[in-house]
């Protein structure tokens, strides 16, 4: 059982690393900045692969009633916000900066649980939230590659992530499994992003993309679609197989590896002040993992 958990954890880390690096390559190196098309493609591939997996009996998708689908609809809207804003932010920000800002979603969740659900919060978790908030708050003033649009979309992204997780937890126990939820997310995302591609201008602007007929672009886009699906699937397996504390530890490990390797592979200018902010954010997340492991 221990070996199986380790294999699932390592698979998750590999998918996490490969997915982020591939997306960053497409968005920042090839500069394919048409999020309705890029995310629409990824969710289409994810939805098709999940549907095929269901038909082959590899996963179980329950036939949900209309009421269950309607209840989940707000979460699907937030999911579209997560991937759309995340794509725009990642195209403009270095991966370590993006991940540090992304972690502020945990502060939103912690604040909601403390203020509205009156849950008892451990001192370690409070310190973690403060460190994550301080790291993200100091970053814009110390980032030598500061991009206002990147930070704006990162804020939209983290707000959507926080709201999505709160909504997801508030519906527990839910008639929808994690796979059911993701299947609905994929379907809704494909439809909404397809309709949004015209008013946003992406549908016709993409015709001017210089690498549109290059194999490296086609290969990278195919890889991003498949890796996104495998990341989703390995995340579900990780959460179902491991305790919350162990799951948080693997996610933290994956983020550290991804952030470290991205600095070597992509152009990232890290001053001592920027590095300090990133390390502060890492310390905050390490404390969060500690509090999760202690409570589970």
UniProtKB/Swiss-Prot annotation:
Listed GO MF terms: antiporter activity; GDP-mannose transmembrane transporter activity; UDP-N-acetylglucosamine transmembrane transporter activity
Location of this chain's protein in the cell: Golgi apparatus, cis-Golgi network membrane
GO cellular component entries: Golgi apparatus; membrane
Induction section of the entry: Up-regulated by inducers of the unfolded protein response (UPR), including tunicamycin and thapsigargin.
Record membrane topology: Multi-pass membrane protein
UniProt KW Transmembrane helix keyword: yes
Origin superkingdom: Eukaryota
Keyword line: Golgi apparatus, Membrane, Sugar transport, Transmembrane, Transmembrane helix, Transport
GO biological process, one term: GDP-mannose transmembrane transport
Transmembrane segments: 7-29, 32-52, 67-87, 93-113, 121-141, 146-166, 187-207, 211-231, 250-270, 271-291
Keyword Membrane: yes
Function statement: Golgi-localized UDP-N-acetylglucosamine (UDP-GlcNAc) transporter that transports UDP-N-acetylglucosamine into Golgi lumen. Contributes to lysosomal targeting of NPC2, a key protein required for lysosomal cholesterol exiting, and that utilizes the mannose-6-phosphate (M6P) modification pathway for its lysosomal targeting.
Family statement: Belongs to the nucleotide-sugar transporter family. SLC35A subfamily.
Protein name according to UniProt: UDP-N-acetylglucosamine transporter TMEM241
């Amino acid at each position: 059982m221990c070996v199986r958990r380790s294999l699932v954890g390592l698979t998750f880390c590999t998918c996490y690393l490969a997915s982020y690096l591939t997306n960053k390559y497409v968005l920042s190196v090839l500069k394919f900045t048409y999020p309705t098309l890029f995310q629409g493609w990824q969710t289409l591939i994810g939805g098709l692969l999940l549907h095929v997996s269901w038909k082959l009996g590899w996963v179980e998708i329950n036939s949900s009633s209309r009421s269950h689908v309607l209840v989940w609809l707000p979460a699907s809207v937030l999911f579209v916000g997560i991937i759309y804003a995340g794509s725009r932010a990642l195209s403009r920000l270095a991966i370590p900066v993006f991940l540090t800002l992304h972690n502020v979603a945990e502060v939103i969740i912690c604040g909601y649980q403390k203020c509205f659900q009156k849950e008892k919060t451990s001192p370690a978790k409070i310190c973690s939230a403060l460190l994550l908030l301080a790291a993200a708050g100091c970053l814009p003033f110390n980032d030598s590659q500061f991009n206002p649009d990147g930070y704006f979309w990162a804020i939209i992204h983290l707000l959507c992530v926080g709201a999505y997780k709160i909504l997801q937890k508030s519906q527990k126990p839910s008639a929808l499994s994690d796979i059911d939820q993701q299947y609905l997310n994929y379907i809704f995302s494909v439809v909404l992003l397809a309709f949004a591609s015209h008013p946003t201008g992406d549908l016709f602007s993409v015709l001017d993309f210089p690498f549109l007929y290059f194999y490296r672009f086609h290969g990278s886009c195919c890889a991003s679609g498949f890796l996104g699906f495998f990341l989703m699937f390995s995340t579900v397996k990780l959460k179902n197989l491991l305790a919350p504390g162990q799951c948080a530890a693997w996610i933290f490990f994956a983020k550290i590896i991804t952030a470290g390797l991205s600095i070597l592979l992509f152009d990232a200018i890290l001053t001592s002040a920027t590095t300090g902010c990133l390390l502060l954010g890492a310390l905050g997340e390490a404390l969060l993992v500690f509090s999760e492991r202690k409570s589970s």
